[in-house]
Swiss-Prot record:
The keyword Iron-sulfur applies. The keyword Secreted does not apply. HAMAP family: Fe_S_insert_ErpA. It comes from the Bacteria. The lineage of its organism: Bacteria, Pseudomonadati, Pseudomonadota, Gammaproteobacteria, Alteromonadales. It holds the Pfam family Fe-S_biosyn. Gene3D superfamilies: HesB-like domain. It comes from Alteromonas mediterranea (strain DSM 17117 / CIP 110805 / LMG 28347 / Deep ecotype). This is Iron-sulfur cluster insertion protein ErpA. One of its GO terms (cellular component) is cytosol. GO terms for molecular function: 2 iron, 2 sulfur cluster binding; 4 iron, 4 sulfur cluster binding; iron ion binding. One of its GO terms (biological process) is iron-sulfur cluster assembly. Iron-sulfur cluster binds at residues 42, 106, 108. The gene is erpA. Its cofactor is iron-sulfur cluster. Binds 1 iron-sulfur cluster per subunit.
Amino acid sequence: MSVETALPIEFSDAAAAKVKTLVSEEENPDLKLRVYVTGGGCSGFQYGFTFDEKVNEGDMTIEKDSVTLVVDPMSLQYLVGGVVDYVDGLEGSRFLVQNPNATTTCGCGASFSV
């Protein structure tokens, strides 16, 4: 009997598929998607996404479909229960965070407050 442990943040199938495509295009299998939170934006905090080859001490990693999502401990506290997703819509294609901790979110979804 196995017990599944819920991860503090989820990585959607769409986000994992897009990361896999981008990593393949760069021909660098060591690249990982790093999501982070910084001060700024119209709501106080903003999400950031970058590709990174390294994992720092204390970082959380989530693997899905052979790709890795990395979150630093400071950002993780604002992202617990969230979902990193990738959307392709009228506002363009982008990674985003569906964050249950956000009390307000700006119109584009790039910044939030808690």
